[in-house]
Regions:
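Sec-dependent bacterial lipoprotein signal peptides
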Residues: 1-15
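Bacterial signal peptide processing site
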Residues: 17-21
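Ser/Thr-rich, Proline-interspersed low-complexity disordered segments
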Residues: 22-63
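N-terminal capping segment at the start of a domain
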Residues: 51-96, 106, 156, 233-234, ...
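A non-catalytic alpha/beta surface segment that caps or lines the substrate-entry region
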Residues: 77-140
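Solvent-exposed loop/turn segments at secondary-structure junctions
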Residues: 84, 109, 116-119, 142-144, ...
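Acidic/histidine-rich catalytic neighborhood of metal-dependent amide-processing enzymes
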Residues: 158-257, 261, 267, 273
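Active-site-adjacent substrate-binding region
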Residues: 229, 236-329
Length: 329
């Protein structure tokens, strides 16, 4: 798969030049003499070979690493240059096109899922009904009925917020994980999703998580059986330890694996004290699927015009990305 020009880090293999042994030097011509008896004969001179030059070992290709600078550039592109991304707005459609193009540049097959969003209240702002979309990236020749993983983040924001932490941070990590997966592969085929209309337009499940609910409705029986786990990345750039969460219905297997990986990778994490239902993983969990969530640290700019790129801590973004990549590998 091709890598994104924005986050491209050129890897150059240094191949060694093989040098064979130099030929033996020719012996000097000897004057002709009469035959001697063996006891009187002198040994003939042996040619001396020049030692061969050792063949240098090629340098090993270093493992791909999470590029925090590239992820922060994506946060700035979404929350700084585009800004608020209400799920039914032109700004959302612009951001969805941007994400789709990035996935394509990485070599993924990209589809979009369109779905309706009702009128309502977006964090104090009346909003009209409209349509939103999910952006779905799958590896080439992906078979949805075979064992696979999903990792996703919602792309939309409430009406007034630029949404740097909520949730350009999650989308930026998803894009960087997709790049790494294209370079090195993952333990199971992985689907990357930017969900639309996660943010509520009212209270209760019926007015929340529209994109992920639509995705789950579209899953056939074989796809549900093939999905081994879904992880949502939501608000992953604030704090000094990565929140590791699960919901009230799913087994804690994903959460526990994250905690073990964090110990191995020496990444600071915190187990969520309560079951979490406030992100897109909840739509999958309600359908009986295994899920987890990274993120959810409270912060002052939540759902406000103050949710700007400067809110996002690059170190926390890196912790989240490295932990998620360890889970995918």
């Amino acid at each position: 798969m091709r890598r994104v020009p924005l986050a491209a880090v050129a890897l150059l293999l240094l191949s060694g030049c093989t040098t064979g042994a130099e030929p033996a030097s020719e012996p000097s011509p000897q004057p002709t003499t009469s035959p001697r008896s063996p006891s009187a004969s002198s040994p003939s001179a042996e040619p001396t070979a020049t030692p061969s030059t050792p063949e240098p070992s090629p340098e090993a290709t270093p493992p791909a690493r999470f590029d925090t600078d590239a992820a922060m550039a994506d946060v700035r592109a979404l929350a700084g240059r585009i800004g608020p991304r209400l799920a039914t707005s032109p700004a959302y459609r612009r951001s969805a096109r941007l994400v789709a193009q990035r996935f394509r540049e990485l070599g993924y097959d990209v589809t979009t899922q369109s779905f309706p969003v009702p009128a309502g209240d977006s964090w104090g702002v009346p909003v009209d009904a409209g349509r939103s979309s999910n952006v779905v990236a799958t590896p080439a020749d992906f078979d949805r009925t075979e064992p696979h993983l999903i990792i996703g983040a919602h792309l939309d924001t409430v009406a007034v917020a630029p949404g740097a932490e909520d949730n350009a941070s999650g989308v930026a990590v998803v894009l960087e994980l997709a790049r790494l997966a294209g370079l090195e592969g993952t333990r199971l085929p992985t689907v990357f999703v930017a969900f639309g209309a996660e943010e509520p337009v009212g209270s209760g499940d019926a007015l929340h998580h529209f994109g992920s609910r639509h995705y789950v409705r579209e899953m056939g029986r074989g796809q549900r059986q093939g999905l081994q786990a879904m992880v949502s990345l939501d608000r992953v750039g604030v704090g000094n330890a990565v929140p590791v969460c699960t919901g009230p219905l799913s087994p804690a297997s994903v959460q526990n694996r994250f905690l073990r990986l964090a110990e191995r990778e020496r990444i600071r994490v915190q187990r969520c004290a309560e079951p979490n239902t406030t992100s897109d993983h909840w739509s999958f969990e309600k359908a009986g699927l295994t899920v987890g969530r990274l993120g959810s640290t409270p912060y002052a700019g939540y759902h406000s015009a103050a949710d700007l790129p400067r809110v996002v801590n690059p170190r926390q973004l890196s912790r989240t990305g490295r932990l998620a990549w360890a889970w995918l590998r």
